[in-house]
From Swiss-Prot:
Comment text on domains: A Gly-cisPro motif from one monomer fits into the active site of the other monomer to allow specific chiral rejection of L-amino acids.
SUPFAM superfamilies: DTD-like
Protein name as annotated: D-aminoacyl-tRNA deacylase
Entry GO MF terms: D-tyrosyl-tRNA(Tyr) deacylase activity; Gly-tRNA(Ala) deacylase activity; Ser(Gly)-tRNA(Ala) hydrolase activity; tRNA binding
CC annotations in GO: cytoplasm
Native species: Enterococcus faecalis (strain ATCC 700802 / V583)
Catalytic activities: glycyl-tRNA(Ala) + H2O = tRNA(Ala) + glycine + H(+); a D-aminoacyl-tRNA + H2O = a tRNA + a D-alpha-amino acid + H(+)
Oligomeric and partner information: Homodimer.
Family statement: Belongs to the DTD family.
Principal cellular location given in the protein's record: cytoplasm
Keywords tagged on the record: Cytoplasm, Hydrolase, RNA-binding, tRNA-binding
GO BP annotations, alphabetical order: D-amino acid catabolic process
């Protein structure tokens, strides 16, 4: 599982020009599911995201988690995180999980974040989405369970 986490002051996702998810302060998370991912990978990433201390405390240091600031997450499925570009110019997505594997794990990911007390907004799995956000920092962090 690979996620790209961006600290944002706001973010939203639209499908066919209709806003389907939006948040204020928190994270916009791009979520890629690998063909070999398991619920254990989901739990690992959720644990990292929920405790990641990248929000400023009273002294201006990155020392607070999304839970501590009562922030939200905009979760966007993103199979292209598993693009391979070694050969040729057209990316291969062979390592990305097929929808029958990816959808349940993506839903589990969002459910586990909510179980941690974090409000989660989402796009729609497999849809053509327009995502907009205001980076805060910017702070961008990548977590890949293949590298833990």
């Amino acid at each position: 599982m690979k996620v790209v986490i961006q600290r944002v002051s706001q973010a939203q996702v639209a499908i066919e020009e209709q806003i389907v998810g939006q948040i204020k302060q928190g994270f916009m998370v791009l979520v890629g599911i690998h063909q070999e991912d398991t619920p254990e990978d989901v739990a690992y990433v959720v644990g990292k995201i929920s405790k990641l201390r990248v929000f400023e405390d009273d002294e201006g240091k990155m020392n607070r988690s999304i839970q501590e600031i009562e922030g939200s997450i905009l979760s966007i499925s993103q199979f292209t995180l598993y693009a391979k570009t070694k050969k040729g110019n057209r990316p291969s997505f062979i390592e990305a999980a097929r929808p029958d594997v990816a959808i349940p794990l993506y839903e589990l990911f969002n459910q586990q974040l909510e179980a941690e007390g974090i409000a989660v907004a989402t796009g729609e799995f497999g849809a053509d989405m327009q995502v907009s956000l205001t980076n805060d920092g910017p702070v961008t962090i990548v977590i890949d369970t293949r590298e833990k």
